[in-house]
Amino acid sequence: MHKLHFWLVAFFMVVHCTSIMADDYVQNNDIPYQENGNEYAKERCKLDFYYPTHVKEFPVVVWFHGGGLEGGGKFIPQELKDKGIGVIGVNYRLLPKAGIQECIDDAAAAVAWAFRNVTRYGGSTSKIFVAGHSAGGYLTDMIVLKKDYLQKYGIDADSIAGAFPFSGQVITHFNVRKARGLSSLTPMVDDTAPLYYVRKLPMPFVLLSGDRELELYGRYEEQAYFWRMMQLHQNDQCLLYEMDGYDHGNMPEAGHKIMVRHIKTICDGKKIKR
């Protein structure tokens, strides 16, 4: 009888603790971040914000989904949950209903929303990180490297605490090239390519790629050249990771762990290392 009583008490303690842990995080969905725009902008320009209620001045990751700039939707990566980090999952307008500049502008507007609003939820504007996978990595590159996009919203891109593009295109995006009648295997670098805007950055910039033999056509090699150009601009806090055995689709599983580790290091005021 005493054993039964003990296990009943233990069971209810576990249930109670699980409930407390669930209450430590809140997720607010479908928050509009663009003040103006047509019906399509009003439909797409929304974000979800997952954040801890038990951490003061928590870091925030603004996360852009992939999908070739023509598909996909906002979500909070499971690997980033329960880490003491706020995560903003962003929807943005897509090709062909929108143009490439509108896609990038939406990404900038979402980051500007973070700078203006995270303190209301307990987050810190000095710990805002930008990241995304594939098309989301491309958007990350563009708004960090070309300062004009965030300047439009009164935000200095150099205020971003760190950037983590996951397998982002750094030459002209393949769907932009496709719209111009070029094949996906015809490389091009113009003013819509992150490579065009390589510069010295004040924040850590971590490039993540899948296995070079499993990635999309030449994607690792793009990252490697991008990394070399960043090094030539004295970006000693620009690191490149290749996820052995991971393809383009599943490489975030490994990449998220690296990102969380580096975010902790940056928030501790230390330099990141491989």
Model-derived segments and spans:
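N-terminal cap/lid segment of alpha/beta-hydrolase-fold proteins
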Residues: 20-55
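Short beta-strand element of the alpha/beta-hydrolase
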Residues: 57-66
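Short amphipathic alpha-helix adjacent to the substrate-entry channel of hydrolases
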Residues: 73-90
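Alpha/beta-hydrolase active-site loop
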Residues: 98-119, 142
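Primarily recognizes the serine-hydrolase "nucleophile elbow" in alpha/beta-hydrolase
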Residues: 115-179, 190
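The feature captures the conserved acid-bearing segment of alpha/beta-hydrolase catalytic domains
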Residues: 154-162, 167-176, 184-224, 228, ...
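C-terminal catalytic histidine-bearing segment of alpha/beta-hydrolase fold enzymes
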Residues: 208, 224, 231-274
